[in-house]
Protein backbone atom coordinates (compact mmCIF):
# COMPACT_ATOMS: atom_id res chain seq x y z
CA UNK A 1 0.00 0.00 0.00
CA UNK A 2 1.17 3.51 -0.77
CA UNK A 3 2.80 5.42 2.02
CA UNK A 4 0.98 8.63 1.10
CA UNK A 5 -2.67 7.68 1.26
CA UNK A 6 -5.75 9.90 1.17
CA UNK A 7 -7.00 10.90 4.60
CA UNK A 8 -10.48 9.44 4.00
CA UNK A 9 -8.99 6.05 3.14
CA UNK A 10 -6.82 6.21 6.25
CA UNK A 11 -9.90 6.86 8.39
CA UNK A 12 -11.72 3.90 6.82
CA UNK A 13 -8.74 1.62 7.43
CA UNK A 14 -8.49 2.78 11.04
CA UNK A 15 -12.20 2.13 11.61
CA UNK A 16 -11.86 -1.36 10.12
CA UNK A 17 -8.85 -2.04 12.34
CA UNK A 18 -10.81 -0.99 15.44
CA UNK A 19 -13.80 -3.14 14.48
CA UNK A 20 -11.61 -6.18 13.93
CA UNK A 21 -11.38 -7.20 17.57
CA UNK A 22 -12.55 -10.23 19.52
CA UNK A 23 -15.71 -10.33 21.59
CA UNK A 24 -14.96 -8.84 25.04
CA UNK A 25 -14.58 -11.34 27.87
CA UNK A 26 -17.29 -9.66 29.93
CA UNK A 27 -19.79 -10.24 27.09
CA UNK A 28 -18.87 -13.94 26.97
CA UNK A 29 -19.31 -14.19 30.75
CA UNK A 30 -22.57 -12.23 30.77
CA UNK A 31 -24.17 -14.40 28.07
CA UNK A 32 -22.94 -17.69 29.59
CA UNK A 33 -20.79 -18.37 26.50
CA UNK A 34 -23.72 -18.12 24.08
CA UNK A 35 -21.87 -15.30 22.34
CA UNK A 36 -18.29 -16.39 21.73
CA UNK A 37 -17.56 -15.69 18.09
CA UNK A 38 -17.76 -12.40 16.28
CA UNK A 39 -19.34 -12.80 12.79
CA UNK A 40 -17.69 -9.69 11.34
CA UNK A 41 -14.12 -10.66 12.25
CA UNK A 42 -11.87 -10.20 9.23
CA UNK A 43 -8.54 -11.80 8.48
CA UNK A 44 -6.18 -9.48 6.61
CA UNK A 45 -5.17 -12.09 4.06
CA UNK A 46 -8.42 -13.97 3.44
CA UNK A 47 -11.00 -11.17 3.17
CA UNK A 48 -10.12 -7.80 1.73
CA UNK A 49 -11.89 -4.50 2.34
CA UNK A 50 -13.62 -2.44 -0.31
CA UNK A 51 -11.41 0.56 -0.89
Curated annotation (Swiss-Prot):
Q: Which GO terms describe its biological process?
A: translation
Task: Give the quaternary structure.
Answer: Part of the 50S ribosomal subunit.
Gene Ontology cellular-component annotations: cytosolic large ribosomal subunit
Keyword vocabulary terms for this entry: Ribonucleoprotein, Ribosomal protein
Q: Which Pfam families does the entry mention?
A: Ribosomal_L39
Family of this protein? Belongs to the eukaryotic ribosomal protein eL39 family.
Please identify the protein, giving its name as recorded.
Large ribosomal subunit protein eL39
Record organism: Thermococcus kodakarensis (strain ATCC BAA-918 / JCM 12380 / KOD1)
Question: What NCBIfam families does UniProt report for this protein, alphabetically?
Answer: PRK01242.1 (NF002316)
What is the gene called? rpl39e
Q: Which domain of life is it from?
A: Archaea
Which GO MF term does the entry hold, naming one? Answer: structural constituent of ribosome
Question: Which InterPro entries does this one have?
Answer: Ribosomal_eL39, Ribosomal_eL39_CS, Ribosomal_eL39_dom_sf
